[in-house]
Amino acid sequence: MFFALAALGLVAMASCEKEAEKTPEAAPELTNETQITGIPFTGGEFTYEFDSNKKWTVAGDAEVTIEGQTYEFGLTPTSGDAGHGVVTVTVPANKGAEEISYSFTLTLLGEDKDTKPLTKTVSLTIPAPSVTDAAGNTYKVVYLKDGNYWMAENLRYVPEGLTPSKDLKNVTAGVYYPIKVSDDHTKAIQTSDENDIKAYGYLYQAETAFGLAINSLKTEEEAKRVEGTQGICPKGWHIPTSKDIINLVGKSVSPFTLNDKAPYYDGKNASIKLLNEDSFNIASWGAISIQDNSKTEATLMGWMKNNPDIISSGYIHGSTFAQKYEFPQGGTQTGIKNIQFLGIMPMAGNGTANGAKLSYKIGASVRCMMDKATKE
Protein backbone atom coordinates (compact mmCIF):
# COMPACT_ATOMS: atom_id res chain seq x y z
CA MET A 1 0.00 0.00 0.00
CA PHE A 2 2.77 2.40 0.95
CA PHE A 3 4.55 1.82 -2.32
CA ALA A 4 1.32 2.32 -4.31
CA LEU A 5 0.62 5.66 -2.66
CA ALA A 6 4.18 6.77 -3.21
CA ALA A 7 3.92 5.90 -6.88
CA LEU A 8 0.72 7.90 -7.23
CA GLY A 9 2.42 10.83 -5.55
CA LEU A 10 5.30 10.71 -7.99
CA VAL A 11 2.90 10.65 -10.97
CA ALA A 12 1.04 13.67 -9.60
CA MET A 13 4.28 15.56 -9.07
CA ALA A 14 5.40 14.76 -12.61
CA SER A 15 2.09 16.00 -13.98
CA CYS A 16 2.44 19.27 -12.08
CA GLU A 17 5.97 19.71 -13.35
CA LYS A 18 4.76 19.19 -16.95
CA GLU A 19 2.01 21.74 -16.37
CA ALA A 20 4.56 24.17 -15.04
CA GLU A 21 6.83 23.53 -18.00
CA LYS A 22 4.02 24.08 -20.61
CA THR A 23 4.94 26.83 -23.11
CA PRO A 24 2.58 29.83 -22.85
CA GLU A 25 0.41 30.46 -25.92
CA ALA A 26 1.74 33.18 -28.22
CA ALA A 27 -0.09 36.47 -27.86
CA PRO A 28 -2.45 37.43 -30.71
CA GLU A 29 -0.60 39.44 -33.34
CA LEU A 30 -1.94 41.55 -36.21
CA THR A 31 0.40 42.49 -39.08
CA ASN A 32 0.33 43.77 -42.67
CA GLU A 33 -2.94 45.57 -42.06
CA THR A 34 -4.40 47.65 -44.89
CA GLN A 35 -6.56 50.75 -44.46
CA ILE A 36 -9.83 51.55 -46.24
CA THR A 37 -9.36 54.98 -47.79
CA GLY A 38 -10.49 56.87 -50.86
CA ILE A 39 -14.14 55.90 -50.53
CA PRO A 40 -16.34 57.93 -52.92
CA PHE A 41 -19.63 59.34 -51.66
CA THR A 42 -21.36 56.75 -53.85
CA GLY A 43 -20.00 53.94 -51.66
CA GLY A 44 -19.17 50.49 -53.02
CA GLU A 45 -17.33 47.35 -51.92
CA PHE A 46 -13.88 47.62 -50.35
CA THR A 47 -11.45 45.10 -48.84
CA TYR A 48 -9.79 45.20 -45.46
CA GLU A 49 -6.80 42.84 -45.36
CA PHE A 50 -4.46 41.69 -42.61
CA ASP A 51 -2.30 38.80 -41.38
CA SER A 52 -3.20 37.13 -38.09
CA ASN A 53 -1.64 34.36 -36.02
CA LYS A 54 -5.02 33.51 -34.50
CA LYS A 55 -8.59 32.87 -35.47
CA TRP A 56 -10.52 36.09 -35.85
CA THR A 57 -13.98 37.64 -35.98
CA VAL A 58 -15.34 40.98 -37.19
CA ALA A 59 -18.48 42.74 -35.98
CA GLY A 60 -20.17 46.06 -36.73
CA ASP A 61 -23.60 47.65 -36.97
CA ALA A 62 -25.56 46.40 -39.97
CA GLU A 63 -27.60 49.64 -40.02
CA VAL A 64 -26.80 53.21 -39.06
CA THR A 65 -29.49 55.93 -39.03
CA ILE A 66 -28.46 59.56 -39.53
CA GLU A 67 -31.02 62.39 -39.79
CA GLY A 68 -33.79 59.93 -40.60
CA GLN A 69 -31.82 58.18 -43.36
CA THR A 70 -30.89 54.52 -42.73
CA TYR A 71 -27.61 53.26 -44.17
CA GLU A 72 -26.88 49.54 -44.50
CA PHE A 73 -23.34 48.20 -44.13
CA GLY A 74 -22.05 44.69 -44.76
CA LEU A 75 -19.05 42.65 -43.52
CA THR A 76 -18.17 39.36 -45.28
CA PRO A 77 -16.98 36.97 -43.92
CA THR A 78 -17.43 37.61 -40.22
CA SER A 79 -14.78 35.11 -39.06
CA GLY A 80 -11.71 33.25 -40.26
CA ASP A 81 -8.65 31.20 -39.36
CA ALA A 82 -5.09 32.28 -38.73
CA GLY A 83 -3.22 33.47 -41.79
CA HIS A 84 -4.15 36.09 -44.37
CA GLY A 85 -7.58 37.58 -43.71
CA VAL A 86 -9.71 39.44 -46.24
CA VAL A 87 -12.97 41.13 -45.23
CA THR A 88 -15.23 42.68 -47.87
CA VAL A 89 -16.86 45.82 -46.50
CA THR A 90 -20.04 46.94 -48.28
CA VAL A 91 -20.36 50.71 -47.93
CA PRO A 92 -23.63 52.54 -48.80
CA ALA A 93 -23.90 55.75 -50.79
CA ASN A 94 -24.03 58.93 -48.71
CA LYS A 95 -27.42 60.58 -49.22
CA GLY A 96 -26.91 63.33 -46.65
CA ALA A 97 -25.08 66.63 -46.51
CA GLU A 98 -22.29 65.63 -44.11
CA GLU A 99 -19.64 62.93 -44.13
CA ILE A 100 -20.49 59.62 -42.47
CA SER A 101 -18.12 57.91 -40.02
CA TYR A 102 -18.40 54.14 -39.52
CA SER A 103 -16.33 51.59 -37.62
CA PHE A 104 -16.23 47.85 -37.01
CA THR A 105 -14.22 45.67 -34.65
CA LEU A 106 -11.68 42.97 -35.50
CA THR A 107 -10.95 40.51 -32.67
CA LEU A 108 -8.10 37.97 -32.64
CA LEU A 109 -8.97 35.03 -30.37
CA GLY A 110 -6.54 32.94 -28.32
CA GLU A 111 -7.10 29.20 -27.85
CA ASP A 112 -6.15 29.31 -24.17
CA LYS A 113 -8.73 30.84 -21.87
CA ASP A 114 -5.95 32.81 -20.20
CA THR A 115 -4.84 34.41 -23.47
CA LYS A 116 -6.16 37.94 -23.78
CA PRO A 117 -7.89 38.63 -27.15
CA LEU A 118 -6.55 41.41 -29.36
CA THR A 119 -9.21 43.92 -30.39
CA LYS A 120 -8.77 46.48 -33.17
CA THR A 121 -11.27 49.17 -34.23
CA VAL A 122 -11.28 49.81 -37.97
CA SER A 123 -12.71 53.18 -39.02
CA LEU A 124 -13.76 54.55 -42.38
CA THR A 125 -15.35 57.71 -43.72
CA ILE A 126 -17.89 58.25 -46.50
CA PRO A 127 -17.42 61.84 -47.70
CA ALA A 128 -20.25 64.29 -48.20
CA PRO A 129 -21.52 64.28 -51.80
CA SER A 130 -19.55 66.53 -54.14
CA VAL A 131 -18.21 66.56 -57.68
CA THR A 132 -15.20 68.23 -59.30
CA ASP A 133 -15.13 69.52 -62.87
CA ALA A 134 -12.27 69.32 -65.38
CA ALA A 135 -10.83 72.63 -64.14
CA GLY A 136 -10.72 71.52 -60.51
CA ASN A 137 -13.81 73.41 -59.29
CA THR A 138 -15.67 71.40 -56.65
CA TYR A 139 -19.45 71.57 -56.25
CA LYS A 140 -21.84 70.52 -53.53
CA VAL A 141 -24.11 67.66 -54.51
CA VAL A 142 -27.52 66.80 -53.08
CA TYR A 143 -29.54 63.58 -53.16
CA LEU A 144 -33.13 64.56 -53.91
CA LYS A 145 -36.45 62.78 -53.46
CA ASP A 146 -36.54 61.79 -57.12
CA GLY A 147 -33.80 59.30 -56.26
CA ASN A 148 -31.00 61.15 -58.04
CA TYR A 149 -27.91 63.13 -57.22
CA TRP A 150 -27.94 66.71 -58.52
CA MET A 151 -25.38 69.49 -58.36
CA ALA A 152 -26.50 72.00 -55.73
CA GLU A 153 -24.47 74.78 -57.35
CA ASN A 154 -24.39 76.19 -60.87
CA LEU A 155 -21.54 75.12 -63.12
CA ARG A 156 -18.64 77.59 -63.34
CA TYR A 157 -16.41 75.70 -65.76
CA VAL A 158 -14.95 77.50 -68.78
CA PRO A 159 -14.43 75.08 -71.68
CA GLU A 160 -11.03 75.10 -73.34
CA GLY A 161 -10.74 77.73 -76.05
CA LEU A 162 -13.60 79.88 -74.77
CA THR A 163 -13.55 83.14 -72.80
CA PRO A 164 -16.52 84.41 -70.77
CA SER A 165 -18.03 87.50 -72.38
CA LYS A 166 -19.73 90.69 -71.26
CA ASP A 167 -20.24 91.82 -74.85
CA LEU A 168 -23.96 91.71 -75.60
CA LYS A 169 -23.22 92.14 -79.31
CA ASN A 170 -21.32 88.87 -79.25
CA VAL A 171 -24.19 86.43 -79.74
CA THR A 172 -21.89 83.45 -80.31
CA ALA A 173 -19.61 83.74 -77.26
CA GLY A 174 -20.80 80.44 -75.81
CA VAL A 175 -20.08 81.51 -72.22
CA TYR A 176 -21.20 84.71 -70.49
CA TYR A 177 -20.52 86.26 -67.12
CA PRO A 178 -23.35 85.92 -64.57
CA ILE A 179 -25.97 88.55 -63.82
CA LYS A 180 -26.82 90.43 -60.64
CA VAL A 181 -28.75 93.54 -59.60
CA SER A 182 -26.82 96.81 -59.84
CA ASP A 183 -25.88 98.56 -56.60
CA ASP A 184 -28.50 101.25 -57.18
CA HIS A 185 -31.17 98.58 -57.90
CA THR A 186 -32.05 100.09 -61.28
CA LYS A 187 -31.03 97.30 -63.66
CA ALA A 188 -29.37 93.95 -64.17
CA ILE A 189 -25.62 93.95 -64.81
CA GLN A 190 -23.03 91.33 -65.60
CA THR A 191 -20.37 90.63 -63.01
CA SER A 192 -16.87 89.18 -63.21
CA ASP A 193 -16.35 89.22 -59.45
CA GLU A 194 -14.98 85.83 -58.35
CA ASN A 195 -17.41 85.61 -55.43
CA ASP A 196 -20.34 86.25 -57.76
CA ILE A 197 -19.11 83.65 -60.23
CA LYS A 198 -18.86 81.11 -57.42
CA ALA A 199 -22.36 82.00 -56.20
CA TYR A 200 -24.13 82.15 -59.57
CA GLY A 201 -21.98 80.22 -62.05
CA TYR A 202 -21.50 81.16 -65.69
CA LEU A 203 -24.27 81.39 -68.29
CA TYR A 204 -23.90 79.07 -71.27
CA GLN A 205 -25.48 78.82 -74.68
CA ALA A 206 -26.95 75.35 -75.22
CA GLU A 207 -24.41 74.13 -77.77
CA THR A 208 -21.60 75.04 -75.38
CA ALA A 209 -23.41 73.26 -72.54
CA PHE A 210 -23.67 70.20 -74.80
CA GLY A 211 -19.92 70.31 -75.51
CA LEU A 212 -20.45 71.43 -79.11
CA ALA A 213 -19.24 74.36 -81.19
CA ILE A 214 -21.63 77.28 -81.56
CA ASN A 215 -23.85 76.96 -84.65
CA SER A 216 -23.02 73.27 -85.06
CA LEU A 217 -26.61 72.06 -84.59
CA LYS A 218 -28.18 72.28 -88.03
CA THR A 219 -31.09 69.83 -87.98
CA GLU A 220 -33.80 68.44 -85.71
CA GLU A 221 -32.13 65.03 -85.85
CA GLU A 222 -28.86 66.47 -84.57
CA ALA A 223 -30.72 68.28 -81.79
CA LYS A 224 -32.46 65.07 -80.72
CA ARG A 225 -29.15 63.20 -80.49
CA VAL A 226 -27.81 65.40 -77.69
CA GLU A 227 -30.42 64.17 -75.19
CA GLY A 228 -28.65 63.01 -72.03
CA THR A 229 -25.24 64.16 -73.22
CA GLN A 230 -22.40 64.67 -70.75
CA GLY A 231 -21.58 67.95 -72.43
CA ILE A 232 -19.43 70.12 -70.16
CA CYS A 233 -20.55 68.24 -67.06
CA PRO A 234 -18.00 66.18 -65.10
CA LYS A 235 -17.50 62.58 -66.20
CA GLY A 236 -20.38 60.40 -65.00
CA TRP A 237 -22.82 63.35 -65.08
CA HIS A 238 -25.08 64.77 -67.78
CA ILE A 239 -27.26 67.68 -68.85
CA PRO A 240 -30.75 66.76 -67.52
CA THR A 241 -33.27 65.22 -69.90
CA SER A 242 -36.99 65.98 -70.03
CA LYS A 243 -37.61 62.80 -68.02
CA ASP A 244 -35.12 63.94 -65.37
CA ILE A 245 -36.75 67.36 -65.18
CA ILE A 246 -40.38 66.24 -65.11
CA ASN A 247 -39.70 63.47 -62.58
CA LEU A 248 -38.15 66.14 -60.37
CA VAL A 249 -40.50 69.12 -60.71
CA GLY A 250 -43.66 67.60 -62.19
CA LYS A 251 -45.02 70.48 -64.24
CA SER A 252 -43.89 71.44 -67.70
CA VAL A 253 -45.06 73.06 -70.90
CA SER A 254 -46.65 71.16 -73.80
CA PRO A 255 -45.91 68.69 -75.37
CA PHE A 256 -44.44 67.28 -72.16
CA THR A 257 -46.85 65.56 -69.77
CA LEU A 258 -47.50 66.54 -66.15
CA ASN A 259 -46.15 64.20 -63.48
CA ASP A 260 -48.30 64.97 -60.45
CA LYS A 261 -46.36 62.38 -58.42
CA ALA A 262 -43.10 64.30 -58.74
CA PRO A 263 -41.69 65.05 -55.27
CA TYR A 264 -41.40 68.81 -55.73
CA TYR A 265 -44.77 69.40 -57.38
CA ASP A 266 -47.06 71.14 -54.88
CA GLY A 267 -50.32 70.41 -56.66
CA LYS A 268 -50.13 73.48 -58.90
CA ASN A 269 -46.50 74.08 -59.77
CA ALA A 270 -42.96 72.98 -59.14
CA SER A 271 -42.02 74.58 -55.83
CA ILE A 272 -38.73 76.40 -55.23
CA LYS A 273 -39.53 76.25 -51.52
CA LEU A 274 -39.82 72.45 -51.52
CA LEU A 275 -36.66 72.06 -53.59
CA ASN A 276 -34.66 74.32 -51.31
CA GLU A 277 -35.92 72.61 -48.18
CA ASP A 278 -33.93 69.67 -49.54
CA SER A 279 -30.89 71.89 -50.19
CA PHE A 280 -31.17 72.13 -53.97
CA ASN A 281 -30.27 75.82 -53.66
CA ILE A 282 -32.21 76.91 -56.72
CA ALA A 283 -32.95 80.57 -57.48
CA SER A 284 -33.60 82.84 -60.45
CA TRP A 285 -30.18 83.88 -61.73
CA GLY A 286 -31.16 85.66 -64.93
CA ALA A 287 -30.12 84.79 -68.48
CA ILE A 288 -28.50 86.22 -71.58
CA SER A 289 -31.53 86.58 -73.82
CA ILE A 290 -30.91 85.85 -77.50
CA GLN A 291 -34.22 84.96 -79.08
CA ASP A 292 -33.00 83.17 -82.20
CA ASN A 293 -30.48 83.19 -85.05
CA SER A 294 -31.89 86.42 -86.49
CA LYS A 295 -30.71 88.45 -83.48
CA THR A 296 -27.41 90.29 -83.50
CA GLU A 297 -27.52 91.63 -79.95
CA ALA A 298 -28.41 90.09 -76.60
CA THR A 299 -30.25 91.56 -73.62
CA LEU A 300 -30.03 90.77 -69.93
CA MET A 301 -33.09 88.88 -68.74
CA GLY A 302 -34.41 88.76 -65.20
CA TRP A 303 -34.66 92.25 -63.71
CA MET A 304 -38.07 93.93 -63.35
CA LYS A 305 -38.93 97.47 -62.26
CA ASN A 306 -41.76 96.28 -60.03
CA ASN A 307 -39.35 94.01 -58.11
CA PRO A 308 -36.05 95.90 -58.32
CA ASP A 309 -34.16 94.22 -55.49
CA ILE A 310 -33.81 90.77 -57.07
CA ILE A 311 -33.33 88.95 -60.33
CA SER A 312 -36.82 87.56 -60.91
CA SER A 313 -36.34 84.82 -63.50
CA GLY A 314 -33.80 82.58 -65.14
CA TYR A 315 -33.24 79.31 -66.97
CA ILE A 316 -31.45 76.01 -66.36
CA HIS A 317 -30.48 74.04 -69.46
CA GLY A 318 -31.97 70.68 -70.35
CA SER A 319 -30.94 68.39 -73.20
CA THR A 320 -34.25 67.14 -74.66
CA PHE A 321 -35.35 68.62 -77.97
CA ALA A 322 -38.67 70.45 -77.74
CA GLN A 323 -39.28 72.39 -80.93
CA LYS A 324 -37.60 73.93 -83.98
CA TYR A 325 -38.28 76.92 -86.22
CA GLU A 326 -36.92 77.60 -89.69
CA PHE A 327 -36.55 80.89 -91.54
CA PRO A 328 -39.37 81.51 -94.04
CA GLN A 329 -38.56 80.54 -97.60
CA GLY A 330 -37.54 83.37 -99.87
CA GLY A 331 -35.95 85.45 -97.13
CA THR A 332 -32.35 86.57 -96.76
CA GLN A 333 -31.69 83.91 -94.11
CA THR A 334 -32.32 80.20 -94.52
CA GLY A 335 -32.20 77.07 -92.44
CA ILE A 336 -32.69 76.82 -88.67
CA LYS A 337 -33.95 80.00 -87.05
CA ASN A 338 -34.30 78.54 -83.57
CA ILE A 339 -34.15 75.26 -81.68
CA GLN A 340 -35.75 74.93 -78.27
CA PHE A 341 -34.90 72.45 -75.54
CA LEU A 342 -36.80 71.69 -72.35
CA GLY A 343 -35.16 73.24 -69.31
CA ILE A 344 -36.22 74.60 -65.92
CA MET A 345 -37.41 78.18 -65.40
CA PRO A 346 -37.07 79.42 -61.79
CA MET A 347 -39.38 82.37 -61.07
CA ALA A 348 -38.70 84.24 -57.83
CA GLY A 349 -41.99 86.15 -57.83
CA ASN A 350 -44.26 83.12 -57.56
CA GLY A 351 -41.67 80.66 -56.28
CA THR A 352 -42.03 78.21 -59.16
CA ALA A 353 -39.48 76.13 -61.08
CA ASN A 354 -41.49 74.53 -63.86
CA GLY A 355 -40.21 72.89 -67.00
CA ALA A 356 -39.97 75.44 -69.82
CA LYS A 357 -38.78 75.67 -73.41
CA LEU A 358 -35.73 77.83 -74.01
CA SER A 359 -33.91 78.85 -77.13
CA TYR A 360 -30.57 77.19 -77.73
CA LYS A 361 -29.08 80.68 -78.23
CA ILE A 362 -29.94 81.84 -74.69
CA GLY A 363 -27.15 81.97 -72.11
CA ALA A 364 -28.50 79.96 -69.16
CA SER A 365 -27.29 78.18 -66.03
CA VAL A 366 -26.14 74.55 -66.01
CA ARG A 367 -26.97 72.06 -63.27
CA CYS A 368 -25.66 68.57 -63.98
CA MET A 369 -27.33 65.35 -62.82
CA MET A 370 -25.45 62.17 -61.98
CA ASP A 371 -25.78 59.25 -64.35
CA LYS A 372 -27.84 56.41 -62.89
CA ALA A 373 -25.29 53.73 -63.80
CA THR A 374 -22.56 55.62 -61.93
CA LYS A 375 -24.72 56.23 -58.87
CA GLU A 376 -25.82 52.62 -58.50
Model region roles, listed by residue range:
Residues 87-91, 98-112:
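A short beta-strand micro-motif common to beta-rich folds, especially ectodomain repeats
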Residues 23-26, 125-376:
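Conserved positions within compact, well-structured domain cores
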Residues 3-37, 110-132, 316, 368, ...:
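Bacterial Sec-dependent N-terminal signal peptides
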Residues 43-47, 84-88, 101, 117-121:
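Intrinsic-disorder/low-complexity, polar/charged segments enriched in Ser/Thr/Lys/Arg/Asp/Glu/Gln
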Residues 37-43:
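Short, solvent-exposed loop/linker segments at the N-terminal edge
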Residues 29-32, 45, 51-88:
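Surface-exposed binding patches on compact interaction domains or structured appendages
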Residues 22, 27, 31, 71, ...:
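Beta-strand-enriched, solvent-exposed domains that form extended recognition/catalytic surfaces
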